[in-house]
Amino acid sequence: MKFALRLLSVITTFVMLIVLIGGALVTKTGSGLGCGRQWPLCHGRFFPEMNPASIIEWSHRMSTGVSTILVLALAVLCWKKISPVFRETKFLVIMSIIFLLLQALLGALAVVFGSNALVMALHFGISLISFASVLLLALLVFEATRSETKLVKPLHIGKKMQFHIYGLITYTYIVVYTGAYVRHTKSSLACSVFPFCSKDGALPAYFNQWVQMSHRAAALLLFVWIFVAMFHAMKHYKEQKQLYYGWIISAILITLQAISGVMSVYSQLALGYALAHSFFISCLFGVLCYFCLLIARFKYESKEPFK
C-alpha cells in the first residue's frame, strides 16, 4: 500500500505539471479554440480533427480529465491514510480539489462563452495553486510512509525569513499573473530587445509595450529579492538544510526563468523556451509553497519563539 500511494502521488504530480505546461502550450500556439466553442466535445466529436490546434486543445482537455481522476483518488487516500498523521493534509486536499475544478471550469467557460485577458490570466495562476497543493501532498505521502527521519522537519525559522517566504510567495503569484497577462494580450513580442523595449532605451510607446515592460520590471524585482533571501539563508541557516539548499535551488530556478524569458524574446517565441519559462516558474512556486509548509510546521510544533 505504501508503494502504491507513493507511486500515485508521483504520477499525479507529474500529470498536474503536464496540465500546467499544456495550458501554456495552448496559449502559445493559439489553440484555445482548436475544438471550436464546444466542450467537452471537439467540433461535435469525441476525437479531434487531425490538425495541430485541435490535437493540442483536445490533449489538454484529456490531461485535465485524467488529472481530475488522479487528484480525487489521491485526495481520498490521503484523507484516510495521511490526515491522521499530518494535520495539514486535509487543507491541502481541499485546496487541490477546489483549484483543480476552478481551473477546469474557467477553461470550459472561456471556450464556450469567450473571456477577456484579465480573467484568462487567472487560469494559469489557479492551476499553479492546484499543482503546488498536489506537490505538497506528495511530500507528505513520502514523509508519512517513511520510518526514518522526517522529510519535513520542524525548523527554527526567524521572523525575517518568514517575511521573505510569505512576501515572495505572494509577489511571485503577482508576477505569474503579469506573465500570463502578457501572453493573453499577445504582448510577448511587443518589445523586441532586452532589457529595454527599444535599442535607444525609449519609454514604451503603446499598451502592449507597457504590459511587457511592467512584467519585466516585476520579474527583475523578484529576481533580486530571491537572491537577497538566498544570501540570508546561506548566512543564518547553514545547519537547516531544507532552507539552505531550498533557497539555492530557488535562485537557480529564477535564473533559468530569466534566461528562458530573454531567449523567448530573441528567438521570436521559440516553443521550447516559452514552455521552459512556464516550467521553471511552476517549480519555483512549488519550492516557495514547501517553505510555507515548513513555517506552518514550525509554528505548530515549536513552543518557544525563535530568537
UniProtKB/Swiss-Prot annotation:
Residues reported to bind heme o: 60, 123
Membrane topology: Multi-pass membrane protein
InterPro entries referenced in this protein's UniProt entry, alphabetically: COX15/CtaA_fam (IPR003780), COX15/CtaA_HemeA_synthase (IPR050450), HemeA_Synthase_type1 (IPR023755)
EC number(s) given by UniProt: 1.17.99.9
Gene Ontology terms: biological process: heme A biosynthetic process
Binding-site list for heme b: 215, 277
Pathway: Porphyrin-containing compound metabolism; heme A biosynthesis; heme A from heme O: step 1/1
Domain notes: The N-half (TM1-TM4) and C-half (TM5-TM8) domains are connected by an intracellular loop. Each domain is formed from four-helix bundles and they align in a pseudo twofold symmetry manner. The N-half domain is the substrate-heme O binding domain and the C-half domain is the cofactor heme B binding domain.
Protein name per its UniProtKB record: Heme A synthase
Organism: Bacillus pumilus (strain SAFR-032)
Lineage of producing organism: Bacteria, Bacillati, Bacillota, Bacilli, Bacillales
